[in-house]
Amino acid sequence: MIKDSSVQVEGQEKVCLDQWVAHYRAYAAKGRSASYIPALGEINVSQLGICIVKPDGTMIKSGDWEIPFTLQSISKVIGFIAACLSRGISYVLERVDVEPTGDAFNSIIRLEIHKPGKPFNPMINAGAITIASLLPGTSVQEKLESLYVLIEKMIEKRPAINEIVFQSEWETAHRNRALAYYLKENGFLESDVEETLEVYLKQCSIEINTEDIALIGLILAHDGYHPIRKEQVLPKEVARLTKALMLTCGMYNASGKFAAFIGLPAKSGVSGGIMTLVPSKSRKDLSFQDGCGIGIYGPAIDEYGNSLPGIMLLEHIAKEWDLSIF
């Protein structure tokens, strides 16, 4: 039975979240939608929502938390985990490195300058496209199935693809096609270019909400252990490596600034989603500091492709509740 004091604290947390979401929603006007993907350009950019999941399963939600959106680059985390589970970490890292890059997420310049063209990390497009070719299976559907199974294992519901967004991405994926063909030429793609690209763009088009990504964040926060179900659902080594990559490479070429001023492992997507997590801290003045997952949605993005009001909201929360890992 939950004590009255716990209920009171959680009520205060909800009041704070509601106030902060209302405040930072106004900053959405300074951002823009990812209009280079036509379907995303039609989204209402004034939306802002958040879901926080604690280890005991308690959820605190505010704003437009239930609005469905596509994973976009957040799917790179899922793809990396799935590839590591099926191929092993060593095999995956022979084809994709773990180094940060200050370039844009869809840049091709590093592949050309640094021989033999190995992608710098799995959180940029070149790395994620390579990872898509490493997923288990011999067909597009079989490779996607490995992602569906993994996601369902973590959030206990089967995801679906937003076909409108996928078609919009497929028709405008000129840069990604260039990346894929360059990777194929250099021997990093293990499957057909067009099939690999279809897998990648469909994984980006998987539809979820803030609760879903908060649950995934919670599991990663606890090194692959699901504290609600009391079950190890991911190998600890894979979860820890994934968190390290999220911290160093997860917020595009704003990852360094994000680590310095917010200090949490996170992965964003141009749809406006941010999946972040708070590892358990030695000092636990607040329940959040015992390890939690956070999902944010705010489709007004900044020049880096990150949710502008979402980052502002998260920075405020991290400071107010002392969530930084540093």
From Swiss-Prot:
A GO MF term: glutaminase activity
Top-level EC class as recorded in UniProt: hydrolase
Catalytic activity from the UniProt record: L-glutamine + H2O = L-glutamate + NH4(+)
Keyword list, A-Z: Hydrolase
Domain of life from the UniProt record: Bacteria
Its EC number(s): 3.5.1.2
Gene Ontology BP, a term: glutamine catabolic process
Family from the record: Belongs to the glutaminase family.
Name this protein carries in UniProt: Glutaminase 2
